[in-house]
Amino acid sequence: MLNLRVIAPNRIVWNSEVREIILSTNNGQMGILPNHAPLLTALDIGVMKIRIDERWSNMALMGGFATIDNNQITILVNEAEKSSEIDPEEAQETFQKAQANLTRAEGKRKTIEAHLAFKRAKARLEAINVTQE
């Protein structure tokens, strides 16, 4: 088993044992199983999949870092939401607004900000859509 802790600036989002996780890193998806080699990695905005026994749970992570050592996983994130905490209607509305803002963005700074908002909205939507499959 792995001991997973997800820590945001204002709260501990997750603190329990899990069987496996799949992270969105800056280099792509990464699966973590028990006895994984020690690792420090940057996390991209995306969905983390968590396997508890035979069921999976999802969490939208808004970037951060993960450390893995001796079956202890500590994830420090800017923000995180469990799929059960996300309102599907609000997530869909936010995604549509972010998509529209991205197409209208002008200038480098506005485009970067719009792209980050789009990635955050997409991660939240993916976290709940994966759950509903």
UniProtKB/Swiss-Prot annotation:
GO molecular function, one term: ATP binding
Statement: the UniProt record of this protein carries the keyword Transmembrane helix: no
Topology class, membrane: Peripheral membrane protein
Keyword Transport: yes
Gene3D superfamilies, A to Z: 6.10.140.480, F0F1 ATP synthase delta/epsilon subunit, N-terminal
Coiled-coil spans in chain: none
Disulfide bonds: none
Annotated keywords: ATP synthesis, CF(1), Chloroplast, Hydrogen ion transport, Ion transport, Membrane, Plastid, Thylakoid, Transport
Gene Ontology CC entries for this record: chloroplast thylakoid membrane; proton-transporting ATP synthase complex
Localization of this protein: Plastid, Chloroplast thylakoid membrane
Main location, first listed in the record: plastid
Xref: Pfam families: ATP-synt_DE, ATP-synt_DE_N
Subunit structure of this chain's protein: F-type ATPases have 2 components, CF(1) - the catalytic core - and CF(0) - the membrane proton channel. CF(1) has five subunits: alpha(3), beta(3), gamma(1), delta(1), epsilon(1). CF(0) has three main subunits: a, b and c.
Job of this protein: Produces ATP from ADP in the presence of a proton gradient across the membrane.
Family: Belongs to the ATPase epsilon chain family.
Name by which UniProt lists this protein: ATP synthase epsilon chain, chloroplastic
Originating organism: Psilotum nudum
Gene: atpE
